[in-house]
């Protein structure tokens, strides 16, 4: 049986439409495009079976398989909607308003039953803030939770008339339910106050009382807000703690730290080698590793294991986001927003680079559920010009491109979701698949050069040195040597070093054919400053030769020693330029 073809919803100032995914890229034959210019919100259900949207007059809900209209709700002012995981409940939210005389407004958060045949309202709440407005359901819908007046209220089996449990701490600011099957776990965040630290605690529902009820606890002082991210197996949470102000003055955008908290009680601060903001944190589908993009530009990207040890370092580059494929076998590192849209597509198993496409001016990225295609889009209001979307194969081939008409805007694009297992992971290919569209982006305008420098060679000077990707795993798996073996190895190394020193002390041969003499004849230029530069360059080159000998003998060099070797060509060029000018 052929795998299904994911739909793509496209919402903008020209209305809303459903587009067939790869390989067709045509409008759905069954869905009738809604031309309303006021489509405020659209949403697929978690399993992708239903699709709903509000066009400024009514909410429509259709079946994705044949676009049959299932429900219509007369709710013209709705600006957000959400489906429960099993499509039992539809939650809608509209802006809270009070009466002209100051009287309390009507409930603006509505819950509707979609399973009873005829849609009906089951509960209404007052939810003043749009932030975190939607109730949180467990995947089996046995539990639903809301944050009400700094405490979490729990409902069971979608019975919203009775509060089954409450989680009350000092001031609960945010919470996250774990994914997956029962038992359900909840992570709660309480901000610090009056000198007390902020903290995140993990609980297992419904065990909220008692001194030992918390599964884990992590406190920290530098936190005005946090973002909590469960892994797919609900065994651990990553907490990105952020402050609004960086007291060190290193950044305008505050300070971030990353914390790891496991349900078995373990916790740790994830040590990031480079200073600067944390741009993105994402779990792999396998729940055993996560990727972090961090540091002042050019940013670093590193994969860590559950011990918070680095596995692989992707080096530095213009990036601020990371996206694992739904199957977890491919990782995309990208730089969107104020960056040029460069993407790096990596094979996660081999940590091998697959492709490096570029999506200029992109503000949105999403994997197709099949794990083979990705979409990049330029959406309003982030960018109001050049709106449109592109669909790529992960090998870097541009397969489809759509530009919205002039004076129109694109607001949202989203793939139709599918349950796990519908699209199994396929073998990764490195050869670009064929495509009809050119993938080459227009070259950016060259940097301005003053007239006096336009006929001179371009300097190779850089503000920073780019760091290459490297594995962070231990290089050797051999058993540790005994004390006697270590002693003998040290003796051999000392003997070898003494021998090399004695060789360097010997006078240089006068053979004119020996162009690689270790002690080249000193050049007297008559300029003390130039002589000093030449002497220093020769000293550095001599040290590099010694490092190369150690490397060829099998000794593992430090990172800074490898960087010195990589600069040999630059130093040789500088020395040549100085000696030519003599």
From Swiss-Prot:
Keyword flag Protein biosynthesis:
yes
Q: Where is this region: Disordered?
A: 436-533
Q: One biological process GO term for this chain?
A: regulation of translation
Q: Which PANTHER family match?
A: EUKARYOTIC TRANSLATION INITIATION FACTOR 2A
From the broadest rank down, the organism's phylogenetic lineage runs:
Eukaryota, Metazoa, Chordata, Craniata, Vertebrata
GO molecular function (one): mRNA binding
User: This protein is called what?
Assistant: Eukaryotic translation initiation factor 2A
Recorded superkingdom: Eukaryota
From the record, what ranges are coiled-coil?
A: 482-580
What residue spans carry the Basic and acidic residues bias annotation?
495-506
Q: Which gene encodes it?
A: eif2a
**SUPFAM superfamilies xrefs:** DPP6 N-terminal domain-like
Q: What are the UniProt keywords, alphabetically?
A: Coiled coil, Initiation factor, Protein biosynthesis, Repeat, Translation regulation, WD repeat
Which GO terms of the cellular component aspect does the record hold? cytosolic small ribosomal subunit
Write out the biased-composition intervals (Polar residues): 510-522
Spans of the WD repeats? 21-63, 73-124, 273-314, 358-402
The similarity comment for this entry is: Belongs to the WD repeat EIF2A family.
Q: Give the species this sequence originates from.
A: Xenopus laevis
Q: What does this protein do?
A: Functions in the early steps of protein synthesis of a small number of specific mRNAs. Acts by directing the binding of methionyl-tRNAi to 40S ribosomal subunits. In contrast to the eIF-2 complex, it binds methionyl-tRNAi to 40S subunits in a codon-dependent manner, whereas the eIF-2 complex binds methionyl-tRNAi to 40S subunits in a GTP-dependent manner.
């Amino acid at each position: 049986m052929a795998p299904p073809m994911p739909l793509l919803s496209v919402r903008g100032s020209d209305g809303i439409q459903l587009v067939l995914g790869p390989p067709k890229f045509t409008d759905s034959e069954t869905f009738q495009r809604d031309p309303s210019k006021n489509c405020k919100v659209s949403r697929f259900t978690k399993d992708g079976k239903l699709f709903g949207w509000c066009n400024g007059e009514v909410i429509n809900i259709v079946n994705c398989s044949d676009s049959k209209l299932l429900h219509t709700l007369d709710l013209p002012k709705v600006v957000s909607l959400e489906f429960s995981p099993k499509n039992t409940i539809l939650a809608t939210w509209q802006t809270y308003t009070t009466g002209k005389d100051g009287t309390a407004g009507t409930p603006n958060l509505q819950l509707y039953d979609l399973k009873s045949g005829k849609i009906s309202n089951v509960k209404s709440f007052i939810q003043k803030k749009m932030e975190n407005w939607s109730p949180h359901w467990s995947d089996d819908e046995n539990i639903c939770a809301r944050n009400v007046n700094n405490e979490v209220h729990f409902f069971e089996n979608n019975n919203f008339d009775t509060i089954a449990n409450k989680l009350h701490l000092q001031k609960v600011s945010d919470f996250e339910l774990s994914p997956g099957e029962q038992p359900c776990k909840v992570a709660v965040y309480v901000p610090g106050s009056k000198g007390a630290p902020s903290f995140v605690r993990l609980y297992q529902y419904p065990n909220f009382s008692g001194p030992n009820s918390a599964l884990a606890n992590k406190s920290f002082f530098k936190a005005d807000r946090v973002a909590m991210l469960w892994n797919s197996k609900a065994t651990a949470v990553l907490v990105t703690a952020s402050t609004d102000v960086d007291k060190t003055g290193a950044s305008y955008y505050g300070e971030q730290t990353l914390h790891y908290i496991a349900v078995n009680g373990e916790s740790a601060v994830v040590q990031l080698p480079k200073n600067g903001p944390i741009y993105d944190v994402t779990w792999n589908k396998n729940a055993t590793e996560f990727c972090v993009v961090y540091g002042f530009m050019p940013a670093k990207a590193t994969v860590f294991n559950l011990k918070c040890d680095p596995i692989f370092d992707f080096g530095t580059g213009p990036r601020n986001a990371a996206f694992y494929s739904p199957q977890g076998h491919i990782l995309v590192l990208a730089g969107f927003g104020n960056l040029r849209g460069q993407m790096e597509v990596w094979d996660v198993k081999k940590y091998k680079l697959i492709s490096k496409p570029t999506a200029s001016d992109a503000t949105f990225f999403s994997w197709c559920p099949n794990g083979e295609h990705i979409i990049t889009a330029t959406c309003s209001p982030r960018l109001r010009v050049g709106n449109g979307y592109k669909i790529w194969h992960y090998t870097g081939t541009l397969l489809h491109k759509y530009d919205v008409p002039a004076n129109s805007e694109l607001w949202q694009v989203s793939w139709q979701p599918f349950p796990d297992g519908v699209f199994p992971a396929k073998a990764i290919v490195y050869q670009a698949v064929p495509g009809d569209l050119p993938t080459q982006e227009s070259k950016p305008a060259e940097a301005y050069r003053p007239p006096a420098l336009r006929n001179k060679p371009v300097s190779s000077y850089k503000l920073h040195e780019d760091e290459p990707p490297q594995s962070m795993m231990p290089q050797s798996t051999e058993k540790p040597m005994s004390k006697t073996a270590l002693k003998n190895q040290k003796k051999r190394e000392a003997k070898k070093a003494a021998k090399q020193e004695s060789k360097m002390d010997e006078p240089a041969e006068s053979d004119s054919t020996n162009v690689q003499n270790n002690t080249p004849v000193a050049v007297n230029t008559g300029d003390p400053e130039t002589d000093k530069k030449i002497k220093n360059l020769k000293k550095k080159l001599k040290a590099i030769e010694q490092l190369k000998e150690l490397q060829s003998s099998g000794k593992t060099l430090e990172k800074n020693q490898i960087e010195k070797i990589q600069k040999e060509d630059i130093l040789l060029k500088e020395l040549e330029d100085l000696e030519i000018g003599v």
